């Protein structure tokens, strides 16, 4: 019997669902354009060395690679579009003066699945602001994300803001033993205050810094900024990340962004993000519908150093949120992996 099934983690999108994704992408690009972002189209394949240059070590396992028959080069199917944007920006300074505002959409393919039911091929639309740093650029990305979520019609969208270096400064000041650092970051990702306290007790830093480590698990919700200020007074290295976060929030609020939450104990994207981070949420979505942040170290890897910030919207999760809000089911699910198959995945964007 002819087997017409798809590989694990992949799926077909039928006309109605495809139309929803196309409509979402069109609405997003309408907002991107109004903010001055210009669209680029990028190839599905890149040389492996270019792709690897732009990924965090944890993301390298997501790369699907093979030898190109014609040239013999090792190439990769893109697992992330941001490194491609960085490569383009570095390769074409004549066409892309700084700062450059670029937007895109398209699929990315990951070798792994992060959890059962999550597709390996993800459809995204996003923006990158290259060559601009500071609170004004941070706020621009934050406002653009909020406006994008509103434009596509999500009900009660919410943006959550953090900073990659706040928790990092506290962990460094606590001087945890090397063998405990990974476990401490994992505990922070689970908001496990007890495990953080146990790790901090073995630190060699000041008592103030060690006491601050378990408090990182509670830096969200009402009063989060007040609690963060108290930590920053005890851990001087945390003061600058907090100030950067508050500066961006002040500008964004002046520009009308209201539904913003804070989580300064965010552990996502360690080693990739260098400043403010953010995520977009909406009722009915299985996870964040958008992720992004500042990644000032990336452009230098491609030979054109400079600050950069951006985000990507997961069109599938956004569609899922809209369909559930309107009572139209649960969206399209991929073929699940077998017990021997992969896991489902997403990158820290």
Curated annotation (Swiss-Prot):
Q: Name one GO molecular function term.
A: histidine-tRNA ligase activity
The record's Pfam families line, in alphabetical order, gives: tRNA-synt_His
- Residues annotated as region Disordered? 325-349
User: Mind giving the lineage of the organism this protein is from?
Assistant: Bacteria, Pseudomonadati, Myxococcota, Myxococcia, Myxococcales
Biochemical pathway: Amino-acid biosynthesis; L-histidine biosynthesis; L-histidine from 5-phospho-alpha-D-ribose 1-diphosphate: step 1/9
Protein species of origin: Anaeromyxobacter dehalogenans (strain 2CP-C)
Q: Which UniProt keywords apply?
A: Amino-acid biosynthesis, Cytoplasm, Histidine biosynthesis
Q: What is this protein called?
A: ATP phosphoribosyltransferase regulatory subunit
> Tell me, what does this protein do in biology?
Required for the first step of histidine biosynthesis. May allow the feedback regulation of ATP phosphoribosyltransferase activity by histidine.
Q: What else is known?
A: This function is generally fulfilled by the C-terminal part of HisG, which is missing in some bacteria such as this one.
